[in-house]
């Protein structure tokens, strides 16, 4: 059976906006979770709240098939841990209790940090250099747990 409901966090960001457009073009029912109010758009069901609100997350993910986690704090250092790490942990915890078929976590190439290697792989040792990179790396470790 083909997936019908796709959820996107971080839909006001560059990757999230494009993800939403593509999912709508594919005929999916799209749900968007945003901290800030967004303008209503055809084909999108809006959920306002943050990644730490379990009640909203449960409603957001109810009967969903796909989740694209594009949200992340890139500017305000004091919010990075709560959004990028704690928010991801909360979202992932709720998602694991649903019937999602697909969970896509968007991270950052920056988690690798500085390297002299020409190519990086899954086995490359990560050495994040700043708070954003560190928090995105911590989030990667959370979602890679079984």
Predicted segment positions?
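Rossmann-fold scaffold of SDR-type NAD(P)-dependent oxidoreductases
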Residues: 9, 64-70, 105
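Conserved NAD(P)H cofactor-binding loop of Rossmann-fold oxidoreductase domains
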Residues: 71-74, 107-109
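Active-site Tyr-X1-5-Lys
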Residues: 129-146
């Amino acid at each position: 059976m083909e997936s019908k409901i796709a959820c996107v966090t971080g839909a006001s960001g560059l990757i999230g906006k494009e993800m939403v457009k593509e999912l709508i073009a594919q005929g999916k029912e799209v749900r968007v979770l945003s901290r800030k109010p967004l303008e209503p758009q055809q084909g999108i069901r809006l959920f306002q709240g943050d990644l730490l609100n379990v009640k909203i997350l449960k409603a957001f993910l109810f009967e969903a098939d796909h989740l694209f986690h594009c949200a992340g704090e890139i500017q305000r250092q004091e919010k990075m841990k709560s959004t990028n790490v704690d928010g991801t942990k909360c979202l992932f915890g709720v998602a694991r209790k649903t019937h999602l078929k697909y969970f896509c976590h968007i991270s950052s190439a920056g988690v690798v940090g500085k390297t002299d290697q020409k190519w990086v792989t899954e086995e490359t040792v990560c050495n994040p250099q700043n708070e954003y990179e560190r928090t995105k790396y911590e989030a990667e470790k959370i979602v890679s747990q079984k």
